[in-house]
């Protein structure tokens, strides 16, 4: 059972950065939302971006919407854990709130691409757990992009072209999940998160926890 301090059963634990990446349309955003809704204490990393706000998006909840000069200033001040250019726009993860969450034993979920994942690893490799989501087929990926009706045909063609490059980096990830059924894929991702949370090296309070029990047994 998880307690309010970010540990399990009273054992202090360091948080982790849980990364989901995929080609556009493979399901990482849907899986991210499902995971945040169900996993206790997991928070979604909020990125800064220069792209225009889409209908229904809220500044500070979905993204921090900033202009290019502001974004460049944040890069110059080393305020990002990772940042990248994606489809003529910029995205970056503010450093301070993530570092505070990990220190408090809370996990942070990242919906980022392979470039961002590599930057996270270069800065904090022991804290990063990465999962790459694949579609079951190219045809299914294209169908999903058309069905969500967010982009023009020209943009969709660009995303399909980009997908091949993104998939080529699958071997840089810790885990691979093929999303041919969203429910099954979600259970797989959730199981990965749970197992990583319980790794001995992340339970930084386990030595004291065991020592205390041994002391009681020796009385």
Swiss-Prot record:
Record-annotated Guanylate kinase-like domain positions: 15-194
Membrane-spanning residues: none
Which InterPro entries does this UniProt record tie to the protein? Answer: GK/Ca_channel_bsu, Guanylate_kin-like_dom, Guanylate_kinase, Guanylate_kinase_CS, P-loop_NTPase
**What EC class does the entry list?**
transferase
Entry-linked SUPFAM superfamilies: P-loop containing nucleoside triphosphate hydrolases
Instruction: Please classify the protein's predominant subcellular localization into one broad category.
Output: cytoplasm
Q: Which reaction does it catalyse?
A: GMP + ATP = GDP + ADP
- Family of the protein in this entry: Belongs to the guanylate kinase family.
What is known about what this protein does?
Essential for recycling GMP and indirectly, cGMP.
Check the record and name the PANTHER family matching this protein.
GUANYLATE KINASE, GUANYLATE KINASE-RELATED
Q: What is this protein called?
A: Guanylate kinase
Organism of origin? Rhodopseudomonas palustris (strain BisB5)
The UniProt gene name for this protein comes to gmk
